[in-house]
């Protein structure tokens, strides 16, 4: 598997991969890793149009400006996407020294260390960005494999909000984690 930065030409394949990845959300023994866009509807595309636009526009925005985003893809020997990690601007205007991390690994490549490689790639890049001091993330507290991965990568737990989300009538806690770059 090779990890490389993505560009605009990669986005159609990335969106197809991400749509498929999000369909695994809480299914067939996979942990629930994010709330579905409509909590009771899992049959339509789980990839909201606004997210597509955020990726398309964000890749061209300079780091430090509102809406910036960087994306890396893990490609297998056939060139298929095996996983991804993105680092993006926080929405708060006074938090330009912080970034948010999101990631995912295709079902066929989980539990092989690829998640750690992706997180390490994002951290290494962020360390090279002088304006960034922190990487933040949000994770459903019950997603124990993801929480364990982030802790092994050096993230620390900053908060856990009980009953933050209600999905299909079930309460879920949300954990907030951070990584100090400096």
What are the residue ranges of the model-derived segments?
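Conserved acetyl-CoA-binding loop-helix of GNAT-fold acetyltransferases
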Residues: 105, 111-125, 147-152
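Conserved GNAT acetyl-CoA-binding A-motif
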Residues: 119, 126-138
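Conserved catalytic-core motifs of GNAT/GCN5-like acyltransferases
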Residues: 134-139, 151, 156-172
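Hydrophobic adenine-recognition pocket in adenosine-nucleotide-binding enzymes
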Residues: 6, 103-105, 139
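Acetyl-CoA-dependent GNAT
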Residues: 19-28, 32-97, 102-108, 180-182
């Amino acid at each position: 598997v090779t990890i490389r930065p993505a560009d605009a030409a990669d986005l159609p394949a990335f969106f197809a991969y991400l749509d498929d990845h999000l369909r695994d959300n809480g299914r067939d023994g996979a942990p629930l890793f994010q709330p579905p866009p409509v909590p009771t509807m899992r049959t339509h595309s789980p990839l909201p149009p606004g997210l597509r636009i955020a990726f398309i526009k964000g890749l061209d925005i300079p780091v430090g400006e509102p809406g910036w985003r960087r994306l890396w893809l893990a490609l297998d020997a056939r060139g298929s996407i095996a996983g991804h990690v993105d680092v993006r601007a926080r929405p708060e205007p006074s938090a330009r020294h912080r970034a948010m991390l999101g990631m995912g690994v295709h079902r066929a490549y989980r539990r092989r260390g690829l998640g750690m490689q992706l997180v390490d790639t994002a951290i290494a890049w962020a360390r090279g960005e002088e304006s960034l001091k922190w990487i933040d993330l949000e994770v459903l507290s019950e997603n124990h494999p993801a929480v364990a991965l982030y802790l092994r990568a050096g993230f620390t737990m900053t908060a856990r909000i009980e009953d933050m989300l209600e999905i299909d009538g079930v309460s879920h806690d949300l954990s907030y984690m951070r990584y100090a770059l400096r």
